[in-house]
């Protein structure tokens, strides 16, 4: 197939009704397609149209707030009786207990905080078991841990998930359309990160079906893009002209037999060409791969499997596994501002590498063949690096090689 073709990729798993397990036949490559872990391949746009066709006209696509009459607690007596009966059936309790639950746990029992009341302070004389457990846990944490990573991560994740919930755009033109698809995309650590190569996403994003693949590509944050090339021991004050992302702009996504290459800039290269040529040599059994331009395709144009590992490659050899774990219609409680998507909702918290000397500040420099360092390589913060390796006039002391260091915890 000609490189950079615009044809919409086919979904062999759908059109051909291919068995997801036996599809590889006698091929000599690992069997990844496990039906209990991922779905069959399907076309995202067609799936969305089928979904919208089922719901259209029923009011289920509306992004407006539900009317007061549709809220819990605003129904009539007959509706309340039916609700009590359903609760009694689900909880295997009596109708009287269900009615008591409705009375005790109803929306009318929710109250605002009084002036000067701090929701973070747990009352001393609480009778609630859950609050008691939480209080003992927090007291133990304060007694035993000075800097609590778990607590910081817990608060951070909550803030990431909640900061955009229900947010509406100031400009009505940026409002997400009713029936828009939202995909949950998990980006795992790059393969070259040996320390953090567990099967754990370090970024989870929500993307819209109508967004181009390049919008996801531009929103992925990776420390490889921030690397600074060159050796700076003789010129530590020289500001670098470029970072890696400015110099090496090539990248691709791989989805279902198609490499989507970023060709927005003249200097972009087709990183997939080497892989395709390797695959086609000696008839390795992978079949024909296709190539396309990333900027010409939206997520609605893709064929994907939920739960299946795909690939994002940039900087030549920095490879991230990408897993799409969910696809759904937008809800009125979602962030409705299109300009905020792709929306980062979760990212992994990393320990930063500290300076070898002060052990307080994050490392900014890494040295090799350093006569002043006890190990090779050795990491220094900016202050300790200059105090140890240069005199008061800024002249270099001794022999060493110095490179700017970008810590993976930069995105914390």
From Swiss-Prot:
One of its GO terms (biological process) is snRNA transcription by RNA polymerase III. The keyword Ribonucleoprotein does not apply. The keyword Iron does not apply. Its main location: nucleus. One of its GO terms (molecular function) is RNA polymerase II cis-regulatory region sequence-specific DNA binding. It comes from the Eukaryota. Part of the SNAPc complex composed of 5 subunits: SNAPC1, SNAPC2, SNAPC3, SNAPC4 and SNAPC5. SNAPC3 interacts with SNAPC1. This is snRNA-activating protein complex subunit 3. It comes from Macaca fascicularis (Crab-eating macaque). The lineage of its organism: Eukaryota, Metazoa, Chordata, Craniata, Vertebrata.
